[in-house]
Amino acid sequence: MLESYRQHVAERAALGIPPLPLDAKQTSELCELLKNPPKGEEDTLLHLLRDRVSPGVDPAAYVKAGFLTAIAKKQVKSPIISPIQAVQLLGTMVGGYNVQSLIELLQFPTVSVSDSSETPLVMGGEGKEPIAAYAAAALSKTLLVYDAFHDILELSKTNPYAKRVIDSWAEAEWFTSRPQLPEYINVTVFKVPGETNTDDLSPATHATTRPDIPLHALAMLESRQPGSLETIAELKKKGHPVAYVGDVVGTGSSRKSAINSVLWHTGEDIPYVPNKRAGGYILGGAIAPIFFNTAEDAGALPIQCDVTKLETGMVITIHPYKGRITNEAGELISTFTLKPDTILDEVRAGGRIPLLIGRTLTDKTRQALDLPPSTVFIRPQQPTDTGKGYTLAQKMVGKACGLPGVRPGTSCEPIMTTVGSQDTTGPMTRDELKELACLGFSADLVMQSFCHTAAYPKPVDIKTHHELPDFFSSRGGVALRPGDGIIHSWLNRMLLPDTVGTGGDSHTRFPLGISFPAGSGLVAFAGALGVMPLDMPESVLVRFKGELQPGITLRDIVNAIPYVAIQQGLLTVEKENKKNIFSGRIMEIEGLPDLKVEQAFELTDATAERSCAGSTIKLSVETVAEYLRSNVALLKNLIARGYQDSRTLLRRIAQMEAWLANPVLLEGDADAEYAAIIEIDLNEIKEPIVAAPNDPDNVKLLSEVANDPVQEVFLGSCMTNIGHYRATAKVLEGAGEVKTRLWIAPPTRMDEHQLKEEGVYSVFGAAGARTEMPGCSLCMGNQARVADGTTVFSTSTRNFNNRMGKGARVYLGSAELAAVCALLGRIPTVQEYLDIVANKIHPFAENLYRYLNFDQIAGFEDEGRVISKEEQALLI
């Protein structure tokens, strides 16, 4: 074991990174060696057990906890670990498999100090107290105890050591024992000018390495600013922490892996947790809200401030309590206000997630003891009630908190009804769930998809495809299968109206209810605990009026939102001192009540590109009821096909049917207040609007970009639905091979099946299209990619530099316009486009833009059945 491990250490050292944590098999072999250690290897073996085994409910932690428990109970002996030291090591495992052992050890017969001549490993000198005292000390700093809290509370009535634990939790000693943030902090600046998106920090081409934090961090900024890692290493020689600084920081979707990479290079090791770092300082003129929250979760200190006077190599002093930044001469160069109110406590606790868990544990303990709330913590300051009405979003979040509504600025923990995870973030979410000691989800429905890696899987992806389904379904989650399609296209069909959720993908933007996308750590928290911390954002109302003009599509309406905001001075494309009215706020959309839910998602989905915290759209009861009837049929079909967890699917079906029996939707109040109101007159939009290379905010009229040659066209992503593919086929029908490389990737297997049944795929074949497996395909650029330096017209979500291909120029627009681009090999003029649409699409629009109503498809519920009808009837 040691020989093979040292070979692995050498391979990783050549890359400048530490070895992987031990797996269960290695840990088991390590435990055997610890019983009879080879001479001279004692320190190495002890280090491996203490520092190189992941905590929580990792399989290796199960082995470690069992071994240490056996030593503590004197069932097994090791010459280098005493029973008391074993208890102390159990206390470093954060929760999960160690908890029950420590509770048992609270009651274990006295072990005198003479049982060992070893000095303690962790918690100071051994006195004359029994082993139960050490178990109490270990549990006092263990926060992830879940239902075991009640066992310890009951035991504390008769057991003095259990009483010590309860008293310690009540006094928040887990928190007060940690150092406060100092009055001033000297840091060395590492600045990336302009915008740093999460693709820069966590390149999609390296997505498969994201769970391996040190390895993935080697790719940070490799395209955006080559040589950055060497620069950071050089800056560290000044002897101060390195602060990451940028004008705009953290836009994009890969927040957790991006934060992991930043903190790997600028943060500090977490004791007893291998290959993970916390802390660090991130300064930005603007910091994307989800990225900001993910930094909070990880124990970093994110600061939004003017960074124009900060340059790489400067040594600056941050004064966190004064809100000042000074240079080496003591001159003031920037000011800031720390947000949220609790940020100092978050940093002290090691992150927002540990603070929330620990503070809840302290509050629960004090409540059980009839003590007043602790004054140790900075409590969130709640806003003054204005007496005005609530917006739709405020009512939805209020409902999830048991309130009529929630005001902006309110700190709350809404119930998470639906949680989504996908396959490039799922392995990180799994690791976070293990660290949170989660063995069962508290959120009502947690879904895992396999949409980003199914088409061209690497060996590590195949491993993920095999392991993640059981991991999620064994905890009560719903696991999709590779080839099923895109997370959002599926998760939307599992939603309940007027509820709140989240997902580990920035495009988790529910068209029913509201969602607040999050990094993998917070998604794991939401799944494990069933709630999520939220500082309620303000809302921006986008109100449409008028009628869609000929040739204008919903994607043009999506792009009209930033277009109008730019005209009104509410949004700028430039990154320095960027203005964005939507950033960190909820976009609430009205004026299009009769859209189908599939169409509505185009609008809510694109709020990710506006850096919104969330979004709502006002729809009619009839629209929502039609969608839910279809979704009931789909979920019943999943049960018939053997999808797990069937109990979760059955529960969601029952909830949908209950809503259909009494279909009522929340509505915003007429006197609700908004940070801004933007009115868009559809009658004034006479030509398509596209996002030009390479920024989703860089929107232009078609007439401004006409005749630009296009080499590749992509029709796919969560922004598409079945109508787009029918319309594209109609444009291409009878035209022979197109003049571009054309990629086709439907969002789900159901779309693909229906399109094949209708003969649409034969048109794609005749056009020379490359048809892809249902899923994300080119959108994220983590597998297939366009040619280097090419110009692309795409229906996907984002057009960041190098995302779809190295040096690619990417336009974003409608499927209909994409089809015309493929036909012509260039962006058409307005008249060319309108003529083609008028002749090839408008006459057939009613038939083309039909949506998948599964309840109306004969025999659909029995398609792919592997569970007999009798078995299914018994389940139901």
Predicted regions located by residue number:
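Short, 15-30-residue, compositionally biased linear elements
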Residues: 1-8, 96, 332, 336-338
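Amphipathic alpha-helical packing elements
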Residues: 2-31, 36, 343-356
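N-terminal alpha-helical segment
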Residues: 5, 64, 82-83, 98-99, ...
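Structural detector for internal amphipathic alpha-helices that build alpha-solenoid repeat scaffolds
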Residues: 17-20, 43-58, 73, 80-95, ...
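Amphipathic alpha-helical scaffolding segments comprising HEAT/armadillo-like alpha-solenoid repeats
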Residues: 24-33, 55-74, 95-123, 144-156
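Short, solvent-exposed loop/edge-beta patches enriched in aromatic
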Residues: 41, 53, 94, 437-444
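Non-catalytic, well-ordered alpha-helical scaffold segments
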Residues: 43-46, 65, 84, 100, ...
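Fe-S-dependent hydro-lyases/dehydratases of central metabolism
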Residues: 105-106, 116-124, 129-876
